[in-house]
C-alpha cells in the first residue's frame, strides 16, 4: 500500500523567479531548514543534499529527476535521523506558468511506500503547506 499526497499554491510571481528559487535546492525560503549541504552540484541527477532542520532532524535527499524544460525536480529521501516511519518517500516539485496573470502554480507531491505511517504523511503535508507559503512570501516581496 502506498500513500500519495499533493499540496499546491498559486504564487504571485513569474515562473522564472519562482523556479530560480526552487531549483537552487537550498530551501533558503523555508524557515524550518537550518542548512543544506550539496554534493556534485545542486541540479545534477544523483547528487545528494543533506538537509538539517531547526529541530535537529537530518535528511539526505538524492535527486532522481531534474528538468529545466518542465520546471520540475524529483528527490527521494535516502536517509533520515530520526527515522521517518515509512519505507520510502519520493517528492516532486513542479512549477507551471499561469499565463492569464503571469503568476506561477507550484505543485509539491509526495509518494510514501507501503507501511507509511499516517503521522509521517500528515507531517509532510503540513510542512509542504508551510514551505509553499514561505516560498510565496520570499518571491512576492
Q: Which sequence ranges carry the predicted segments?
A:
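Hydrophobic ligand-binding cavity/cleft-lining segments
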Residues: 1-44
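Beta-strand/loop substructures that line and gate deep hydrophobic ligand-binding cavities in soluble
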Residues: 80-130, 141
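A generic beta-sheet turn/junction motif
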Residues: 11, 54, 99-101
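Hydrophobic pocket/interface hotspot
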Residues: 18-22, 49, 63, 75, ...
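Hydrophobic/aromatic beta-strand elements that line small-molecule binding cavities or substrate pockets
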Residues: 9, 59-65, 89-98
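Short amphipathic alpha-helical signal-transduction/dimerization elements
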Residues: 26, 129-140
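Glycine-rich portal/gate segments that line the openings of hydrophobic small-molecule binding cavities
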Residues: 29-82, 141
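Short beta-strand segments
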Residues: 5-7, 57-61, 104
Amino acid at each position: 500500500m502506498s500513500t500519495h499526497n499533493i499540496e499546491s499554491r498559486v504564487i504571485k510571481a513569474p515562473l522564472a523567479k519562482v523556479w530560480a528559487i526552487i531549483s537552487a535546492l537550498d530551501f533558503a525560503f523555508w524557515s524550518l531548514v537550518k542548512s543544506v549541504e550539496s554534493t556534485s552540484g545542486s541540479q545534477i541527477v544523483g547528487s545528494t543534499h543533506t538537509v538539517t532542520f531547526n529541530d535537529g532532524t537530518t535528511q539526505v535527499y538524492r535527486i532522481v529527476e531534474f528538468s529545466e524544460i518542465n520546471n520540475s525536480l524529483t528527490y527521494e529521501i535516502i536517509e533520515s535521523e530520526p527515522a521517518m516511519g515509512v519505507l520510502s518517500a519520493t517528492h516532486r516539485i513542479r512549477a507551471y506558468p499561469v499565463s492569464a496573470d503571469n503568476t506561477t502554480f507550484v505543485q509539491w507531491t509526495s509518494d510514501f511506500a507501503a507501511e507509511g505511517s499516517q503521522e509521517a504523511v500528515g507531517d509532510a503535508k503540513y510542512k509542504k503547506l508551510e514551505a509553499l507559503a514561505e516560498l510565496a512570501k520570499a518571491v512576492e516581496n
